[in-house]
């Protein structure tokens, strides 16, 4: 498994490292982890005032300031990683690097150093989400799970995307720990206020509560039908 972990020295990227460390015993020896730092380029006017070698040393020094504490932390956890830094737009470069590896998983915080407090996701995370086709795990600014076994929610709607999510989770079950619990989640339509107009345009009585529940159950069953065989074959009983 190849994992790409973009870091910027923020508490959010520290949580990404903590999550990786919490999964280390589960990922196995074949896992490859790359730490990636993406630096903003110096303004063109400033860059023209120094030689290319000096400019590269500046970028290397800036990247090392971020790599050093991350490297120290992971080494203490017995985790070996590779490192890479790139200069450019963070979202664009993270997506490009994930494609180049190719990464089986990108792990990053929901925000970084430059995020605005009012955003649900930071601009870089949103940008990566919009650009990449690689699986992306977005971590909130909370401590890494202490227990090996995780509770995993998988949203399904009967589409190929829901099926792909289930296939990914089953292919990388070790990431979630032994004895992990898997929950299938489907959001059904709200029929509570549904009425049926008659030919004269008059509204007939709304659906009964039992009819609404029956319709919602049917939607749910249809949404999980494509993934039932996959789960059964893997010996996973979803909740």
Language-model features: where?
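Small/aliphatic-rich secondary-structure junction motif
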Residues: 1-52, 150-209, 229-236
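Gly/Ser-rich helix-loop-strand patches that form or flank binding pockets
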Residues: 2, 11, 15, 25-26, ...
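Structured loop/turn residues at secondary-structure junctions
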Residues: 8, 86, 112, 141, ...
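Aromatic/hydrophobic pocket-lining residues that form π-stacking "cages" and hydrophobic walls in ligand
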Residues: 20, 70, 94, 128, ...
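Structural beta-alpha unit
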Residues: 22, 54-57, 72-106, 229-239
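General small-molecule cofactor/ligand-binding pocket signal
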Residues: 34-36, 82-86, 137, 183-185, ...
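A short acidic, glycine-rich active-site loop
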Residues: 53-65, 206-222
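Fold-core signature of tandem repeat domains
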Residues: 166, 223-224
